[in-house]
């Protein structure tokens, strides 16, 4: 029985109790939000070492880290290092997007290594296997896709992205609304290509009940993918994006009524002035289900720095109600991220999540900032390092800048404002 079905029956699960303790909420409040579909707890019954996380309304903003192999770069040990680094940096979830090598082996290793929820996009494995076998993705057999979904669920995958909103209905009008970057979602483009070449409906949409049955069996949370998300500022909030969102809104309630936990994915590339509208529209159309956003990136001109453009957009989106931020690394649009890129991406989006929690009135976030300010006033460096989002980097920079032997730092030295005011006897200026 899924977390959602148990919540609807009034049962408080161990996972709900863990989430309640972390969020400083009552278990009953968490149960109620899960029952309403406003909070999800991705927790596959087969993920043995999982520390459950709650995602959704009224909870702290969570951050996901994408990783995985590609056909060009396939080093298993690197991906496992990324898992460790991402979790250490504060990632609340991991997605394995591998497309190269032994996909079953790497996924199982990641699940075994990860104490946080693990997500996948099953279509990637089905497409990769089809391409390797036939050299033509259009020959993908829907039965293979569902076999992959069942296998991944049995392995312990906690949430799955499925692009069920990309349908033949939308395909009919696709070319009526031209875009600068067309379709940038891998899952969306694969689905469109398959439907066009086979003249058939998206199998995940056509057999949605079959998909739900698998999810219900293992308590896999569905993440309804945004296959038509805008891939450029010029395409943000266009007709295709909204058409897909409306379809996803229909499927949210249907899935929830079948006892399956569900969240909804969102854009993409969105200018700052459109972020509030995007979040509120999604929440309205999708019954306040948890909203999972990729950034969003607020400008297109920063390759090499897109963890920053994503953090800016993520802070805004989360402030207006987004619940789950997918990180973006400095390597976005350029190549597969390194271990160092993963750490940078997680920390950038953790800063965004914390900034949003702070603005949303989260007492724990406010207390942490307050304590940091007190430590700075007291020139208490050890306490500052403890409270820092990346203690190791803060400590290293202080040492490298020649500050470790002085009470203040090498920026101001004896002219340190804090030092001067402290020597004044604690009076307020």
UniProtKB/Swiss-Prot annotation:
The lineage of its organism: Bacteria, Bacillati, Bacillota, Clostridia, Thermoanaerobacterales. One of its GO terms (biological process) is thiamine biosynthetic process. Substrate binds at residues 66, 95, 124, 163, 185-187, 226-229, 265, 292. This is Phosphomethylpyrimidine synthase. Gene3D superfamilies: 6.10.250.620, Radical SAM ThiC family, central domain. It catalyses: 5-amino-1-(5-phospho-beta-D-ribosyl)imidazole + S-adenosyl-L-methionine = 4-amino-2-methyl-5-(phosphooxymethyl)pyrimidine + CO + 5'-deoxyadenosine + formate + L-methionine + 3 H(+). The keyword Flavoprotein does not apply. Catalyzes the synthesis of the hydroxymethylpyrimidine phosphate (HMP-P) moiety of thiamine from aminoimidazole ribotide (AIR) in a radical S-adenosyl-L-methionine (SAM)-dependent reaction. GO terms for molecular function: 4 iron, 4 sulfur cluster binding; carbon-carbon lyase activity; zinc ion binding. Belongs to the ThiC family. Its cofactor is [4Fe-4S] cluster. Pfam families: ThiC_Rad_SAM. The keyword Protein biosynthesis does not apply. Pathway: Cofactor biosynthesis; thiamine diphosphate biosynthesis. [4Fe-4S] cluster binds at residues 409, 412, 416. Binds 1 [4Fe-4S] cluster per subunit. The cluster is coordinated with 3 cysteines and an exchangeable S-adenosyl-L-methionine. GO terms for cellular component: cytosol. Keywords: 4Fe-4S, Iron, Iron-sulfur, Lyase, Metal-binding, S-adenosyl-L-methionine, Thiamine biosynthesis, Zinc. It comes from Carboxydothermus hydrogenoformans (strain ATCC BAA-161 / DSM 6008 / Z-2901).
């Amino acid at each position: 029985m899924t977390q959602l079905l148990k919540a609807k029956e009034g049962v408080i699960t161990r996972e709900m109790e863990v989430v309640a303790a972390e969020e400083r909420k009552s278990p009953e409040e968490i149960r109620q939000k899960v029952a309403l579909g406003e909070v999800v707890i991705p927790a596959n019954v087969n993920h043995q070492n999982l520390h459950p996380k709650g995602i959704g309304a009224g909870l702290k903003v969570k951050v996901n880290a994408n990783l995985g192999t590609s056909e060009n770069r396939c080093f298993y040990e690197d991906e496992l290092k990324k898992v460790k680094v991402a979790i250490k940096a504060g990632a609340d979830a991991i997605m394995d997007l591998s497309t190269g090598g032994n996909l079953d082996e790497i996924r199982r290793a990641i699940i075994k290594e990860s104490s946080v929820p693990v997500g996948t996009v099953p279509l990637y494995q089905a497409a990769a296997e089809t391409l390797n076998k036939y050299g033509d993705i259009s020959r993908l057999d829907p039965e293979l896709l569902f076999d992959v979904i069942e296998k991944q669920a049995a392995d312990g995958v906690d949430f799955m992205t499925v692009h069920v909103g990309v349908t033949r209905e939308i395909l009919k009008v696709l070319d009526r609304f031209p875009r600068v970057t067309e379709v940038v979602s891998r899952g969306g483009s694969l689905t469109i290509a398959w439907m066009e070449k086979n003249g058939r409906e998206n199998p995940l949409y056509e057999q949605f009940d079959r998909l739900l049955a698998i999810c219900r069996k293992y308590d896999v949370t569905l993440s309804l993918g945004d296959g038509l998300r805008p891939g450029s500022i010029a395409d943000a909030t266009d007709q295709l994006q909204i058409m897909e969102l409306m379809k996803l809104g229909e499927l949210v309630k249907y899935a929830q009524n079948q006892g399956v936990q569900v969240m909804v994915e969102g854009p993409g590339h969105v200018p700052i002035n459109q972020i509030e509208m995007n979040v509120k529209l999604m929440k309205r159309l999708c019954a306040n289900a948890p909203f999972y956003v990729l950034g969003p990136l607020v400008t297109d001109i920063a390759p090499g720095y897109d963890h920053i453009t994503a953090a800016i957009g993520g802070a805004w989106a989360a402030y207006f109600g987004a619940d789950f931020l997918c990180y973006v690394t400095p390597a976005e649009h350029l190549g597969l991220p390194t271990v160092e890129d993963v750490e940078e991406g997680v920390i950038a989006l953790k800063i965004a999540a914390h900034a949003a929690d702070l603005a949303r009135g989260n007492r724990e976030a406010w207390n942490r900032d307050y304590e940091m300010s007190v430590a700075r006033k007291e020139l208490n460096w050890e306490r500052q390092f403890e409270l820092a989002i990346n203690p190791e980097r803060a400590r290293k920079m202080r040492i490298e800048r020649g500050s470790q032997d002085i009470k203040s730092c090498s920026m101001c030295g004896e002219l340190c404002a804090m030092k001067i005011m402290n020597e004044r006897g604690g009076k307020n200026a």
